[in-house]
């Protein structure tokens, strides 16, 4: 500001605007009415801008025009204020200076101003080339200035508007936007404006209809026949919820914030009146409401888009193919033959999805069918669920050899699945803040079904060849799809969801006439769907007792194969971060060794050692290595080493160390992991009390994640430690760093310098917002020789080093480590030397306390 009058003008307008906003925000806090808020905020800004325009005495031949959302007549607390400075011609230097002063004043008023300076010709030319500009001008609104000039813009804009072209451009833009958000409204941190099912989807519909002069409100679309009254009411209600969420987010963040970030979800939920219960956080209750609204928006959005498209692009050849007297196929879409079909014949609801699976060429449901399903929700009641015909139809859908995943997803999108399986409805939109699931429970369940179905599809056999091989020989695989549908169906009820889900599964099987044999398998899978994962990732698979106990739980090969396939599909369906090749190897190893036990193989130490020795010798001979050269190294190692290592790993270590068994210097060897992901690193050195911590510290500094560790001590005091590590940042390209790891880690071990203090590693926002209470469990194993140390906590960089340093401080040696990272949570299991712990109970207590301190956030 150059002059005192302008300073005074700015101060007066700013103070007035600030006071108006405070009053409006207080009203909103009191009544939670979002529509009056965004309207009154817009009016307050209108007044501020027109006063600034008048105060600066802008020329009368210029027009100040509101565009975008502001032009639409609504303004959220911290939204951009988009304006167009419409000129009659190119501005001279004097005009440009005045316009710059006006824009500067707007910023001084505290407005997030978005401005453009154009003539009418500029607007028409640029809107033709840019769909964003064309859209912003659709809702242009004159604030002050040259009315005739603004009218000229409107006339030319409307004359140039091609509704069909606009529809196609906005549809493409929407698809690109949805792809950016993975085509799902069910993100952990959805954007209430831009994500699928968000406010932008509603705006796109109204932009399309306004461009086609079909209406610019849900009421008008109802009057034009594009919506039913009920659909218009539903859209109005969900739009109001999304608007309220967006306004609350802005106010909580104190800035423009459209993403429901973890940091704000709890405060936002409390602003809506939600409170934490025994089974659900307040944030989970709010997010479920959001997901239901977004789902409804997505569903109605699909109906409206297809209807608008049909009006703008009437097909000249509306060829239909009759399927039966209830359904036809029209241009690849399954269509009902009468609007009231589902009310007259409720059986046709499930028949829709069976025909969708069975009819070649059908790729979706027509607008008429989608609308019919949407409006038939009241028909889907208890009597409909209990109808024997419907039960036969649903079982047929699940047993169909193709199209199952797509059919179930479509049933969920149209809310039919949740209305048929009423317990499924309870978990629709239920988020799991357990730090490793990234999908809502219903989406996770359908993802697991999809993963198992892919094992059965020839085109996907390259993804998991072993699983595909097992699936190909599995009789009646549909029992697996049913088990997948029920494995997490009891989440969020309180209690053990596996046992509660088992009851649901048995009831379903009884109601649907499923045989006793298949019922028992389905129910057993639901009850034990976590068992194999727990054994593989937390127990010692080289312990014959562990494998025998697991084999007793499983009982036979069919149950084992079914559980293995479900476990792989389940872990892969939690999050892209959770599955890795190492977990795959552990599960496959457990499957194969258990199958041997079930087949009658002996599982005693001597027979296993004999088999391992023969396999290792075969591996060595494949590499043209004389097995006799292995004797000096093998004579130094206990039988436990051979029991805990794979034959190919023993062969690799033998070839790497056979001529270095008495090396005075550390020997470090690294190779691409045979598991298919990451590195395998071996360290051979004179044993040190803090060796495990020292190695963990190196891996922490290099940002490697340790997946597994095996710690051995030779009879003459050497340590032979092997590690399975990964580095997410390398994206699988590890070859260039093998030599670097061997050199640097060797130096780190050789120097034996004091252990540095652990760093307080960074936590993800999710972990900060939903911390879990650290847990430490220390108990002796059955033989009393070792102690099992189980640790669970929020994951963070350097956590394993912090644990290892505490163990080193107390001179507790690590025998093995099983590192289980589940998204943002770790569940690690260590086998530690029990000699000192057994002799001193106080040491156990102090160790547990020090570990809890190290795990604390």
From Swiss-Prot:
Q: Where is this region: Uridylyltransferase?
A: 1-322
What range(s) does the HD domain occupy?
441-563
Which keywords are on file for this protein? Answer: Hydrolase, Magnesium, Multifunctional enzyme, Nucleotidyltransferase, Repeat, Transferase
Cofactor(s) required, per the database record? Mg(2+)
- Could you tell me which residue ranges the ACT domain spans? 680-760, 788-857
> Which SUPFAM superfamilies is this protein grouped with?
ACT-like, HD-domain/PDEase-like, Nucleotidyltransferase, Nucleotidyltransferase substrate binding subunit/domain
Free-text note regarding domains: Has four distinct domains: an N-terminal nucleotidyltransferase (NT) domain responsible for UTase activity, a central HD domain that encodes UR activity, and two C-terminal ACT domains that seem to have a role in glutamine sensing.
Name of this chain's protein: Bifunctional uridylyltransferase/uridylyl-removing enzyme
Q: Which organism is it from?
A: Cupriavidus metallidurans (strain ATCC 43123 / DSM 2839 / NBRC 102507 / CH34)
The gene designation is glnD
């Amino acid at each position: 500001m150059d002059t005192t009058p302008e300073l005074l003008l700015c101060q007066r307008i700013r103070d007035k605007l600030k006071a108006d906003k405070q009053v409006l925000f207080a009203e909103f806090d009191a009544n939670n009415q979002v529509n009056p808020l965004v309207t009154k905020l817009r009016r307050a800004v209108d007044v501020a801008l027109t006063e600034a325009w008048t105060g600066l005495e802008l020329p009368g031949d210029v027009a100040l025009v509101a565009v975008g959302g502001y032009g639409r007549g609504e303004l959220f607390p911290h939204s951009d204020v988009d304006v167009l400075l419409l000129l009659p011609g190119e501005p001279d230097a004097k005009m440009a200076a005045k316009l710059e002063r006006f824009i500067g004043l707007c910023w001084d008023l505290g407005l997030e101003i978005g401005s453009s300076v154009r003539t009418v010709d500029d607007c028409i030319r640029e809107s033709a080339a840019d769909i964003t500009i064309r859209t912003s001008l659709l809702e242009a609104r004159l604030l002050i200035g040259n009315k005739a000039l603004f009218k000229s813009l409107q006339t030319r804009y409307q004359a140039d508007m091609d509704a069909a072209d606009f529809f196609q451009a906005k549809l493409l833009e929407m698809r690109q936007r949805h792809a950016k958000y993975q085509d799902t409204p069910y993100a952990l941190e959805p954007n209430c404006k831009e994500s699928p099912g968000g406010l932008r989807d509603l705006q796109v519909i109204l932009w399309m209809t306004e461009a086609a002069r079909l209406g610019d409100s849900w009421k008008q679309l109802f009057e034009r026949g594009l919506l039913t009254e009920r659909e218009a009411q539903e859209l109005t209600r969900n739009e109001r919820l999304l608007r309220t969420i967006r306004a609350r987010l802005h106010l909580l963040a104190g800035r423009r914030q459209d993403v429901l970030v973890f940091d704000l979800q709890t405060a936002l939920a409390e602003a809506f009146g939600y409170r934490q219960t025994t089974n659900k956080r307040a944030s989970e209750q709010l997010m479920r409401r959001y997901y239901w609204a977004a789902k409804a928006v997505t569903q109605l959005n699909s109906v409206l888009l297809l209807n608008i498209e049909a009006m703008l692009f009437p097909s000249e050849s509306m060829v239909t193919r009759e399927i039966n007297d209830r359904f036809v196929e029209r241009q690849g879409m399954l269509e009902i033959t009468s609007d009231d079909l589902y009310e007259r014949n409720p059986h046709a609801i499930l028949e829709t999805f069976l025909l969708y699976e069975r009819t070649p060429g059908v790729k979706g449901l027509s607008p008429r069918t989608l609308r019919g399903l949407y409006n038939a929700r009241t028909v889907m009641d208890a009597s409909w669920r209990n109808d024997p015909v419907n039960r036969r139809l649903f079982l047929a859908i699940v047993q169909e050899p193709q199209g199952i995943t797509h059919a179930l997803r479509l049933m969920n999108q149209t809310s039919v699945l949740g209305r048929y399986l009423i317990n499924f409805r309870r978990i629709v939109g239920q988020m799991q803040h357990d730090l490793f699931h990234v999908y809502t429970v219903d989406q996770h369940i359908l993802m697991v079904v999809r993963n198992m179905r892919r094992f059965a599809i020839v085109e996907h056999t390259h993804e998991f060849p072993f699983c595909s091989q097992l699936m190909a020989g599995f009789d009646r695989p549909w029992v697996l799809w049913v088990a997948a549908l029920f494995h997490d169906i009891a989440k969020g009820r309180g209690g053990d969801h596996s046992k509660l889900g088992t009851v649901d599964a048995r009831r379903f099987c009884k109601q649907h006439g499923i045989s006793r044999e298949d019922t028992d398998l389905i129910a057993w899978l639901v009850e034990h769907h976590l068992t194999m994962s727990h054994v593989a990732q937390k127990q010692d698979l080289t312990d014959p007792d562990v494998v025998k106990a697991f084999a007793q739980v499983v009982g036979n090969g069919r149950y084992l194969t079914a559980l293995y396939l479900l476990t792989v599909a389940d872990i892969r369906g939690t999050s892209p971060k959770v599955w890795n090749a190492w977990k795959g190897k552990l599960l496959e190893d457990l499957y194969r060794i258990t199958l041997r036990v079930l087949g009658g193989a002996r599982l005693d130490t001597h027979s296993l050692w004999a088999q391992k020795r023969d396999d290792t010798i075969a591996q060595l001979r494949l590499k043209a290595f004389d097995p006799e050269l292995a004797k000096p190294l093998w004579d130094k190692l206990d039988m436990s080493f051979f029991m805990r290592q794979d034959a190919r790993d023993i062969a690799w270590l033998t070839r790497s160390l056979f001529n270095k068994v008495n090396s005075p210097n550390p020997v470090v060897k690294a190779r691409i992991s045979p598991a298919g992901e990451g590195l395998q690193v071996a360290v051979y050195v004179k044993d040190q009390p803090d060796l495990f911590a020292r190695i963990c510290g190196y891996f922490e500094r290099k940002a490697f994640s340790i997946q597994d560790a095996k710690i051995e001590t030779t009879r003459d005091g050497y340590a032979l430690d092997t590690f399975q590590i990964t580095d997410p940042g390398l994206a699988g390209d590890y070859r260039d760093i093998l030599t670097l790891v061997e050199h640097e880690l060797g130096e780190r071990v050789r120097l034996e310098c004091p252990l540095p203090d652990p760093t307080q590693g960074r936590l993800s926002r999710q972990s900060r917002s939903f911390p879990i209470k650290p847990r430490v469990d220390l108990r002796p194993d059955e033989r009393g020789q070792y102690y099992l140390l189980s640790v669970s906590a929020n994951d963070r960089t350097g956590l394993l080093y912090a644990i290892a340093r505490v163990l080193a401080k107390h001179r507790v040696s690590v025998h093995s480590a099983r590192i289980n990272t589940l998204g943002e949570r770790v569940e690690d299991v260590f086998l530690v030397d029990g000699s000192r712990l057994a002799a001193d109970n106080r040491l156990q207590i102090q160790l547990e306390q020090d570990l809890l301190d190290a795990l604390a956030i």
